[in-house]
Amino acid sequence: MVSIAINGFGRIGRLVLRIALERKNIDVVAINDPFISVDYAAYMFKYDSTHGKYKGEVSHDGSNLIINGKKVAVFQEKDPATLPWGKLGVDIAVDSTGVFKELDSAQKHIDAGAKKVVITAPSKTAPMFVVGVNEDKYNGEKIVSNASCTTNCLAPIAKIINDEFGIEEGLMTTVHSITATQKTVDGPSHKDWRGGRTASGNIIPSSTGAAKAVGKVLPELQGKLTGMAFRVPTTDVSVVDLTVKLVKAATYDEIKAAVKKVSEGKLKDVVGYTEDAVVSSDFLGDTHSTIFDAAAGIQLSPKFVKLVAWYDNEYGYSTRVVDLVEHVA
């Protein structure tokens, strides 16, 4: 049994809790969020505009969240170093704040007594792992990153294509649902002026490090991929459009077959495959990291193709966070 604590009770933190409660070998002992009181934590966990009402009993006793009779301690500390992780016997702290994402800041959880930390964001300094791609390279590191939702969608597909046909170079676009950092109406966003525009009424070009990060989890693709994002007014589910120049000539049917084979093998929980006439909402709550849309891709020539893959950027990603927790435990 692995004891975990969740720091940051936002979109990812709450879904990680939902998913972890379903796993028999995980015991969630605590939640910390300086901005959320215990009664509000109960409300936010119970009601979700995107994924629906939680299907169990949720209440609180003033200091614990009570879910189906199970107590989870709730704290409101700004500094993770002050949390009682040692006393609570926390094996792994899941940091989903988006704030403590480097080795030095995530170390605060170790200082507080946690044995290991899983960061739910890309990191410049912590080793990044994408389940289904490079988790076998994990070598006991105390602090790891689960990379980003988009890297989790792109990397498995890039690996399949590179292993089978070779990728000379490629460009990725993610058409990405809105997230909490965006604005409901035009407002100040000093680092990213476009990002400060109304989320619900615009298609907003944005940067993403997701494609470059693939080179960190798959060194053979280092320097071969880069990408950008368009933020669009949907609440959840995003789609990766990967345009690649192949090393080896292939037919589109051969590419489809290669992905389908992987989706039916040991990576069936990570890679999905569909030939149906699907749209984004069809993937709400999908637990795969990536679902290859065989009917949407196109080919110009034997070495030049555009591939399309869907992902629930909240739920699929949060599922992988919990998988990585189990793996590093």
Swiss-Prot record:
EC number in record: 1.2.1.12
Modification Phosphoserine, positions: S148, S177, S200
A GO biological process held by the record: glycolytic process
Subcellular location field: Cytoplasm
A single GO cellular-component term on record: cytosol
Entry GO MF terms: glyceraldehyde-3-phosphate dehydrogenase (NAD+) (phosphorylating) activity; NAD binding; NADP binding
Binding site for NAD(+): R11, I12, D33, E77, N313
Any Pfam family hit: Gp_dh_N
Statement: the UniProt record of this protein carries the keyword Transit peptide: no
Residue positions binding D-glyceraldehyde 3-phosphate: S148, C149, T150, T179, T208, G209, R231
Residues of the site described as Activates thiol group during catalysis: H176
Enzyme active site: C149
Pathway(s) per entry: Carbohydrate degradation; glycolysis; pyruvate from D-glyceraldehyde 3-phosphate: step 1/5
Chief localisation class: cytoplasm
Protein keywords: Cytoplasm, Glycolysis, NAD, Oxidoreductase, Phosphoprotein
Reactions catalysed, as given in the entry: D-glyceraldehyde 3-phosphate + phosphate + NAD(+) = (2R)-3-phospho-glyceroyl phosphate + NADH + H(+)
Coiled coil: none
Matches recorded under Gene3D superfamilies: Dihydrodipicolinate Reductase, domain 2, NAD(P)-binding Rossmann-like Domain
Subunit structure: Homotetramer.
Recorded family membership: Belongs to the glyceraldehyde-3-phosphate dehydrogenase family.
Protein name: Glyceraldehyde-3-phosphate dehydrogenase 1
Species in which this protein is naturally found: Kluyveromyces marxianus
Upper taxonomic lineage: Eukaryota, Fungi, Dikarya, Ascomycota, Saccharomycotina
Gene designation: GAP1
